[in-house]
UniProtKB/Swiss-Prot annotation:
Family label: Belongs to the chromogranin/secretogranin protein family.
The species this protein was found in: Homo sapiens
Biased composition (Acidic residues): 171-180, 229-249
Protein name according to UniProt: Chromogranin-A
Entry GO terms, CC: chromaffin granule; extracellular region; extracellular space; neuronal dense core vesicle; perinuclear region of cytoplasm; secretory granule; transport vesicle
Gene Ontology process terms (BP): adenylate cyclase-activating adrenergic receptor signaling pathway; defense response to bacterium; defense response to fungus; defense response to Gram-negative bacterium; defense response to Gram-positive bacterium; innate immune response; killing of cells of another organism; mast cell activation
UniProt gene name: CHGA
Signal peptide: 1-18
C-alpha cells in the first residue's frame, strides 16, 4: 500500500512540473516574439507587404533588449566608418609623402643640371675674356700705328671736316655731343675692369669726331659766343651745386663714382674751343699766310688735340653697362629729390615753430602790458577816488564839486572800452593766422608721415 501511494504521489508531481506556469515575464517574452515574427514576415513579404501593428511597434520600442541590440548595431556601423576614414587618411598621407619625395628628387636633379650648365658656361666665358684682352691689346697697337701714320694725310680730311662742320646745324652738334658724353659711363666704376675692343674703337672714333667738329665750329664766330655762354652757365650751375649745404644734400655722399672722364672731356673741349677762338679771331692773318703755313698750323693743332683726347678714351668707355649706370643715376637722383623735400619740410617746420614762438611772445608781452596798464589805472582811480569824497566832506552842497567828481570817471571809462574793442579786433586776425598755421602744420605732418611710409615701403 505504501509503495502504491508513493508512486501515485510521484506521478502527480511529474504532471505538475510538466504543466507551464503562466507568469507575467513569460507573457512579455511571448508578445515580443510575436512582434518579431510580424516584422520578419513584413520584411520577407516585400512584393506584398504585411503591415506591422501599432501594438507591436510599442512593445518593441519599450523592450530594452531590442534597444541594446540596435545600439550595438549602430556602434558597429560607426566603428566601420571610422576604420574606413583611417584607411583613406593613411593612403592620402602616403601619396603626399611620395609626392614630396618626387619633388625633392626633381629639385636636386635640377640643381645638379644647373651646376653643370654653369660650369660649362664659365669655361668658355674665361676663354672669351682672354680673347677680348688679346683683341684689346691688338687694337691698342693698331690704334697707335694709325695715330703715327695719320699726320701724313691731314690736309684733305681737314678740308672735308671743315665743310661738314659748316654744313651741320649748331643744335644738331649740341645734341650729338651730349649723346656722346651721356652714353659712355665713367671710368671709376669697379665693376668695369676689362675694356673691350669695341669700346676702344668707339673712343677713337669719338675723339676724331670731336676734333673735326671743333675745327668746323672754329669758322663760325657766332657759334663760339654761344658756346662760351653755355660754358659759363654750366660753371655757374656746378658752383651752385657745390654751394648746397650738407642739410639739403645728404645723399651727395652716397655717390662713390664721380664722373672723372666727363670732366676730362669738358677740359679737352674747352681747350679746343679756346684754340678755335684764337683761330677765328685772326681770319685775316690766316688768309694772308700761304697754304703751306696753314697746313702746318692745322697739323700742329691736331697733334695737340689728339694728345689731349688720347688720355680720355683710356679711362672712358670700359664695358657696355650703360643700363646699370643709368639705373644708379636714377636711384641717386631720386634720393637727392627726397632729401631736398625733407630739407624743405624741415625748413618749413622750423619757420612755423619760430613764427609760433614769436607770436606767443608778442601775445605774452601784450597781455603783460595790458595788465600793467589796468593795474596802474586801478591804482590811479583808487588814489583819485577819495579826492571828491574829501571835497564833498568839505563842501557837500556845492554842485560844481559833484560834477568834477563824476566827469573824470565817465571820461576815463570811454578810452578803456575803445582800447578793449581795438584789442579784440587785433586778436581776431591773429587767431585766424594761428588757425591757418596749425592747419599748415597738420598738412606738413601728414606729408612727412606719407614720405616715411614710402621710404619704409
Amino acid at each position: 500500500m505504501r509503495s502504491a501511494a508513493v508512486l501515485a504521489l510521484l506521478l502527480c508531481a511529474g504532471q505538475v512540473t510538466a504543466l507551464p506556469v503562466n507568469s507575467p515575464m513569460n507573457k512579455g517574452d511571448t508578445e515580443v516574439m510575436k512582434c518579431i515574427v510580424e516584422v520578419i514576415s513584413d520584411t520577407l513579404s516585400k512584393p506584398s507587404p504585411m503591415p506591422v501593428s501599432q501594438e507591436c511597434f510599442e512593445t518593441l520600442r519599450g523592450d530594452e533588449r531590442i534597444l541594446s541590440i540596435l545600439r550595438h548595431q549602430n556602434l558597429l556601423k560607426e566603428l566601420q566608418d571610422l576604420a574606413l576614414q583611417g584607411a583613406k587618411e593613411r593612403a592620402h598621407q602616403q601619396k603626399k609623402h611620395s609626392g614630396f619625395e618626387d619633388e625633392l628628387s626633381e629639385v636636386l636633379e635640377n640643381q645638379s643640371s644647373q651646376a653643370e650648365l654653369k660650369e660649362a658656361v664659365e669655361e668658355p666665358s674665361s676663354k672669351d675674356v682672354m680673347e677680348k684682352r688679346e683683341d684689346s691689346k691688338e687694337a691698342e697697337k693698331s690704334g697707335e700705328a694709325t695715330d703715327g701714320a695719320r699726320p701724313q694725310a691731314l690736309p684733305e680730311p681737314m678740308q672735308e671736316s671743315k665743310a661738314e662742320g659748316n654744313n651741320q646745324a649748331p643744335g644738331e652738334e649740341e645734341e650729338e655731343e651730349e649723346e656722346a658724353t651721356n652714353t659712355h659711363p665713367p671710368a671709376s666704376l669697379p665693376s668695369q675692369k676689362y675694356p673691350g675692343p669695341q669700346a676702344e674703337g668707339d673712343s677713337e672714333g669719338l675723339s676724331q669726331g670731336l676734333v673735326d667738329r671743333e675745327k668746323g665750329l672754329s669758322a663760325e664766330p657766332g657759334w663760339q659766343a654761344k658756346r662760351e655762354e653755355e660754358e659759363e652757365e654750366e660753371e655757374e650751375a656746378e658752383a651752385g651745386e657745390e654751394a648746397v649745404p650738407e642739410e639739403e644734400g645728404p645723399t651727395v655722399v652716397l655717390n662713390p663714382h664721380p664722373s672723372l672722364g666727363y670732366k676730362e672731356i669738358r677740359k679737352g673741349e674747352s681747350r679746343s674751343e679756346a684754340l678755335a677762338v684764337d683761330g677765328a679771331g685772326k681770319p685775316g692773318a690766316e688768309e694772308a699766310q700761304d697754304p703751306e703755313g696753314k697746313g702746318e698750323q692745322e697739323h700742329s693743332q691736331q697733334k695737340e688735340e689728339e694728345e689731349e683726347m688720347a688720355v680720355v678714351p683710356q679711362g672712358l668707355f670700359r664695358g657696355g653697362k650703360s643700363g646699370e649706370l643709368e639705373q644708379e643715376e636714377e636711384r641717386l637722383s631720386k634720393e637727392w629729390e627726397d632729401s631736398k623735400r625733407w630739407s624743405k619740410m624741415d625748413q618749413l617746420a622750423k619757420e612755423l615753430t619760430a613764427e609760433k614762438r614769436l607770436e606767443g611772445q608778442e601775445e605774452e608781452e601784450d597781455n603783460r602790458d595790458s595788465s600793467m596798464k589796468l593795474s596802474f589805472r586801478a591804482r590811479a582811480y583808487g588814489f583819485r577816488g577819495p579826492g571828491p569824497q574829501l571835497r564833498r566832506g568839505w563842501r557837500p552842497s556845492s554842485r560844481e564839486d559833484s560834477l568834477e567828481a563824476g566827469l573824470p570817471l565817465q571820461v576815463r571809462g570811454y578810452p578803456e572800452e575803445k582800447k578793449e574793442e581795438e584789442g579784440s579786433a587785433n586778436r581776431r586776425p591773429e587767431d585766424q593766422e594761428l588757425e591757418s598755421l596749425s592747419a599748415i602744420e597738420a598738412e606738413l605732418e601728414k606729408v612727412a608721415h606719407q614720405l616715411q611710409a614710402l621710404r619704409r615701403g
